[in-house]
Amino acid sequence: MGASCTATQSQFLLYTLTSSEETVGSVGDSCRGPEEEAEKPVKTKTVSSSNGGESSSRSAEKRSAEDEAADLPTKPTKMSKFGFAIGSQTARKASAISIRLGASKPKETVPTLAPKTLSVAAAFNEDEDSEPEEMPPEAKMRMKNIGRDTPTSAGPNSFNKGKHGFSDNQKLWERNIKSHLGNVHDQDN
């Protein structure tokens, strides 16, 4: 329990020392070797003890660490970052590639549309008394769409379509029988 508490305190102190240079908890902090951790100066703060206000003697290690920290310049040394930082990488890549839109291209003049509009208006002018075009016979046959030989006779909605268009074969048979009976009855009289 004591070791984890000191580790947390050392991480906090490390964070306070290097807050302007790098963040705690990045992948780079956990990947450093023991040599790099030993080179960092550790500042210690005096914390009030729970021994009732009595003065406590500091160990030689703490005094030497404070002396070393005092000897070093106050400006923290810049460490090379080793890790994955999304924000800093995108900023660097953006500065490497610069795209300027419209700066290199000369402005083109837009041609006037007045001559084209006049020719289009002349093509669709209905004021002229010209004779309408005649349809070719093939187009007329397709528009009528009557009979078995039309292109839609084999379509999905062409069930019961015969030579005479859509018809019911049973009714056609009954009509033919009635007409034959009528012809036979007329012949007998």
From Swiss-Prot:
Residues with Phosphothreonine modification: T150
Function: May be involved in cell cycle regulation.
Protein name, as recorded: PEST proteolytic signal-containing nuclear protein
Signal peptide: none
Post-translational modification: Ubiquitinated; mediated by UHRF2 and leading to its subsequent proteasomal degradation.
Highest taxon listed in the record's lineage: Eukaryota
Residues recorded with modification N6-acetyllysine: K75, K161, K163
Cross-referenced Pfam families: PCNP
Modified residues (Phosphoserine): S64, S88, S98, S130, S158
Record keyword Ribonucleoprotein present: no
UniProt organism field: Rattus norvegicus (Rat)
Entry keyword annotation includes Nucleotidyltransferase: no
Region (Disordered): 21-84, 145-169
Comp. bias intervals (Low complexity): 48-58
Gene Ontology terms describing biological process: proteasome-mediated ubiquitin-dependent protein catabolic process; protein ubiquitination
Polar residues composition bias: residue spans: 150-160
